[in-house]
């Protein structure tokens, strides 16, 4: 429920999509998060304000659960959504694909690598409509990839139009993608290979050469 996760935005947009498609009795948004996260929004307040608690249109999962129960949760939903405006990788969507459940994601960060292998798609992509540059004293600048809600509505419609079998086929392709490209055998091999290459090219601490070309000047 951090600000960049856009949890409040997702709830507002989900409510609008329910209104547009008359699906208040047929669709449910399940969020596994902390609704009182000090770095996020008060999700209880948003849900109550939008009256999304009347038919339990939005459910919150707030306690830690076992991997088996988490896998069951992914298995019982139609898709997993991530509309974060910045995402390093996105563990939840990787978990979703590994359980055979397709995803709807913002095309930012590592999410771009998860949703497609360059040939097949394992969900519905959302392309940023604008980019903002934000920052702080510690982080001078970072990009925010912002979405248009109409594109979100369209993605939801497309996902539902696939039907149960279409979503299953897409999700199983995504699972194959995860098993092939994110397994621990490959991870261990690539990790060791990268460290050896770094040592070979950059040297050890006493013989390091990555700072060549950098000039240090005294500032009065």
Question: Each predicted region: which residue ranges?
Answer:
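Conserved donor-binding/catalytic loop of nucleotide-activated donor transferases
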Residues: 75-77, 95-107, 117-119
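Aromatic "clamp/platform" in nucleotide-sugar-dependent glycosyltransferases that forms part
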Residues: 85
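A conserved mid-protein helix/loop that constitutes part of the nucleotide-sugar donor-binding site
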Residues: 2-18
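C-terminal amphipathic helix plus adjacent low-complexity
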Residues: 139-145, 149-220
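Nucleotide-activated donor-binding/catalytic signature segment of Leloir-type glycosyltransferases, i.e.
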Residues: 40-68, 72
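Short glycine/serine-rich donor-binding loops of glycosyltransferases
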Residues: 90-93, 111
């Amino acid at each position: 429920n951090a600000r960049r996760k856009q949890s409040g935005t997702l709830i507002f947009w989900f409510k609008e999509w329910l209104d547009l498609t008359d699906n208040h009795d047929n669709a449910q948004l399940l969020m596994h998060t902390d609704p009182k996260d000090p770095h996020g929004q008060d999700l209880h307040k948003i849900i109550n304000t939008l009256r999304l608690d009347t038919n339990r249109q939005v459910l919150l999962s707030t306690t830690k659960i076992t991997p088996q129960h988490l896998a069951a949760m992914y298995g019982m939903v139609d898709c997993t959504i991530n509309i974060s405006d910045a995402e390093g990788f996105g563990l939840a969507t990787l978990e979703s694909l590994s359980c055979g459940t397709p995803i709807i994601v913002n095309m930012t960060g590592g999410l771009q690598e998860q949703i497609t292998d360059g040939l097949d798609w394992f969900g519905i992509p959302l392309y940023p409509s604008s980019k903002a540059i934000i920052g702080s004293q510690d982080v001078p600048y970072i990009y925010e990839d912002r979405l248009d809600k109409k594109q979100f509505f369209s993605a939801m419609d497309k996902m539902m139009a696939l039907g149960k079998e279409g979503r299953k086929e897409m999700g199983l392709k995504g699972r194959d993608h995860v098993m092939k490209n994110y397994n621990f055998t490959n991870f261990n091999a690539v990790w060791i290979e990268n460290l050896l290459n770094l040592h070979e090219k950059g040297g050890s601490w006493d013989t390091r050469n990555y700072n060549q070309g950098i000039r240090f000047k005294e500032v009065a």
